[in-house]
Amino acid sequence: MQGRLSAWLVKHGLVHRFLGFDYQGIETLQIKPEDWHSIAVILYVYGYNYLRSQCAYDVAPGGLLASVYHLTRIEYGIDQPEEVCIKVFAPRKNPRIPSVFWVWKSADFQERESYDMLGIFYDNHPRLKRILMPESWIGWPLRKDYIAPNFYEIQDAH
């Protein structure tokens, strides 16, 4: 069984993998990092004009890192907007995914948080730098193989 968007992508020859539906019936797709930017632009043109959220997670210690995008198709007069969940997996050794900041501006802080916590580099992001941790912090705190430092000194501002 395929979802509506997956069938549309297949019809237009766009490479993806259908992962199923979540508990709310939202279609979930996997897109390769090298295809993500062009498919993101196509999804925006198709009507997915709102990035509801972006998050990231560590799939397994030593394994892949995932960047997850929840997109919504908002139209006037529609009570139940169409939603889709996109997952983009990147290798741990060189986790690079194209930024969608230039497609959905709301990706700005969300991609920065994913970079800060998991070390996923979002190519072509205009301000990719730490947003929660100090600039001097070493490592990526939400990776499953992260070893927390025994001590970290936060210096006073004065």
UniProtKB/Swiss-Prot annotation:
It catalyses: a plastoquinone + NADH + (n+1) H(+)(in) = a plastoquinol + NAD(+) + n H(+)(out); a plastoquinone + NADPH + (n+1) H(+)(in) = a plastoquinol + NADP(+) + n H(+)(out). NDH shuttles electrons from NAD(P)H:plastoquinone, via FMN and iron-sulfur (Fe-S) centers, to quinones in the photosynthetic chain and possibly in a chloroplast respiratory chain. The immediate electron acceptor for the enzyme in this species is believed to be plastoquinone. Couples the redox reaction to proton translocation, and thus conserves the redox energy in a proton gradient. The gene is ndhJ. GO terms for cellular component: chloroplast thylakoid membrane. It is a peripheral membrane protein. PANTHER family: NADH DEHYDROGENASE [UBIQUINONE] IRON-SULFUR PROTEIN 3, MITOCHONDRIAL, NADH DEHYDROGENASE UBIQUINONE IRON-SULFUR PROTEIN 3. This is NAD(P)H-quinone oxidoreductase subunit J, chloroplastic. NDH is composed of at least 16 different subunits, 5 of which are encoded in the nucleus. One of its GO terms (molecular function) is NADH dehydrogenase (ubiquinone) activity. Its EC number is 7.1.1.-. Disulfide bonds: none annotated. One of its GO terms (biological process) is photosynthesis, light reaction. It comes from Manihot esculenta (Cassava). It is found in: Plastid, Chloroplast thylakoid membrane. Keywords: Chloroplast, Membrane, NAD, NADP, Plastid, Plastoquinone, Quinone, Thylakoid, Translocase, Transport. InterPro entries: NADH_DH_suC (IPR010218), NADH_quin_OxRdtase_su_C/D-like (IPR037232), NADH_UbQ_OxRdtase_30kDa_su (IPR001268), NADH_UbQ_OxRdtase_CS (IPR020396). Belongs to the complex I 30 kDa subunit family.
